[in-house]
Amino acid sequence: MSLVRLLILIVLLSAASLRAESPAEQAVLAAIKSPQLTVVHLWAPWCSNCLAELKTGGWTKIVNENPQVKFYLVSIWNDGQDGRAMLNKFGITAQPNVTILADPGPRRGENKIKQLAGLPLSWIPATWIYKGGDLRYALNYGEVRFPVLQQFLTDSQSEWSHKGEPSIE
């Protein structure tokens, strides 16, 4: 009987390690709990939509014009590479309110990341705005329009929250 228990324990530990959070995800999870406004941008240097966003200068401008906001640029599906060289071309890496991270996973295959911080990932770029642990906005499946992102950042400075509201169920 003890051999069966040992095998069950090994299987359970193996399953738990498969779902372990990467250092990048751990950093994001810690950051989004902050009371300050936090933007998590998921991207990859090989992604044409991500490059289009960078080439417009929108990210550089939004980072510079919002020094009170923390930006986490997380390269995903890029075999653990953070894309820092690409971001450096656009003057983003030297900004004090920017943290550059990389998920260690590959672009394809069963080890490709499918969620981050509890949210599904199926397309990049994706941009999430948090304040005090609350997801304020999620812009998924394509390029962000920077005037819209700026409006969302402005709106997110308010103190509104859905906590304490009655359930609709």
Place the predicted regions along the sequence by residue.
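Bacterial N-terminal signal peptides
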Residues: 5-15
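A short beta-strand-turn-helix
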Residues: 20-37, 61
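Non-globular targeting/processing and membrane-anchoring segments
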Residues: 21, 151-169
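Short active-site neighborhood of thiol/selenol oxidoreductases, capturing the structured segment around
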Residues: 32-51
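Loop/turn elements at helix/coil->beta-strand transitions in domains of secreted/extracellular proteins
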Residues: 34-39, 67-70, 94-97, 124, ...
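Solvent-exposed loop/turn segments at secondary-structure junctions
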Residues: 44-49, 76-81, 104-107, 135, ...
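Structural microenvironment flanking redox-active thiols in thiol-disulfide oxidoreductases
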Residues: 51-92, 106-112
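Thiol/disulfide oxidoreductase modules built on the thioredoxin-like
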Residues: 105-150
